[in-house]
Amino acid sequence: MAEFTALFGPAGNSESFSAMGYRKTLQVPEYLEEMGLDACEYQCGRGGNISQEKAAEFGAACREKGIYVSLHAPYYISLSGVEESKRLNSINYILQAARAVNAMGGERIVVHSGSCSKISREEALALAMDTMGLAQKALDDEGLSNIHICPEVMGKINQLEPWKRCFPSAPSMNVSSHAWILVTSIPALSAA
């Protein structure tokens, strides 16, 4: 049986980060350690333009403090967009996010699926599954098979949310009407 580890941390910085005198992104791991947390989600929701060098520096600071890092990909990703160009651009955004989190030493990118727009949920789901397959192939082709794409849902009526139907064997826990948490084993952190 697989061993599971629950990690806790914020997505981005809270008001207490600056209230406690912290100012720089590289201080996030120290802040999290002081707060007794062991994870963080680096926010690129409005677009991420972090260099590989800065990402690696942030990741090293996180490992030094035993902080597991994931990354939230841009909100404008649309896995179920009816315009093929938007879906293909979404794959590029996923690749950019994957490169950044990989440089940080993380393995997970959080991705919103987008909305159903003017098509049925079934059509949107088919498009999203196709886009996810293309995104996974792009990750594999680039040597980033270690990166997990983690779909996140928002509980909005027009959002595509039936991920559990797509991945019925994935262990999960329905924590609210707003999200599915995919429970996976997380490897031990190393200072390497």
Provide a role label for each language-model segment.
Residues 167, 189-192:
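A short alpha/beta connector and helix-capping loop motif
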Residues 1-96:
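N-terminal pre-domain/capping segments
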Residues 67-71, 177-182:
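Non-cysteine beta-strand/loop elements that form the S-adenosyl-L-methionine
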Residues 16-24, 117-120, 191-192:
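Alpha-helix capping and helix-coil boundary motifs
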Residues 173-174, 186, 190:
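Alpha-helix capping/termination and helix-coil
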Residues 1-4, 156, 177, 185:
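Charged, low-complexity C-terminal accessory regions
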Residues 14-16, 44-48, 73-77, 113-117, ...:
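Active-site-proximal loop/turn and secondary-structure-junction residues that shape catalytic pockets
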Residues 64, 80-177:
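Active-site acidic/histidine proton-transfer and metal-coordination neighborhood
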